[in-house]
Amino acid sequence: MQSCLLPVRVRVSLLAGVSVVLSILCPQSSRAEPHPHQTVTVLAVNNGQEVLVDFGGEGRAMRLACLQAPLAQQQPWASAAADQLRELLPSGTEVTLEFRARDVYGRVVARLLLEGNDIAESLLSQGAVFAYDGYLGQCNDLSYLRFEAEARETSRGLWTVPGGPERPWNLIEASGGELEP
């Protein structure tokens, strides 16, 4: 009977090749998910909804859950949102990360709590960002719409424009997905 086993060198090469392909196709599979609640350090604010945090010595981008900041093209609102987030979370700030999911870009999506206070609530109250549930479909436990409504009723931030500026998700959809949130 003839053996159908491949030589060891060929098997090792095939296994290595499959590992490389899987790491390219599924990059987050090699990263452990964050704990549901953990303390992380802010390294930088990338924009009004994305923060670079230190996960055990590795810098990773994370997106604030259940909100949408104005897009870079939506000035001055995008810069104002980023500036307000930088003011709330200067580099080196320790925060509690409450993991929710990963988005389509592979980013961790989470709530960030500073001394027990939800950073997103502050941004929404200031009228810096929009409440948005489009990515997760699981934001009903949060009162973000209430904070947005209060900012809108008092004409704070982006709500100084009647009705507010164009919603970022509408711009993204109109671009055929070319614009990245």
Where are these regions (language model features)?
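Small beta-barrel nucleic-acid-binding modules, primarily SNase/OB-fold domains
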Residues: 2-7, 11-17, 22-181
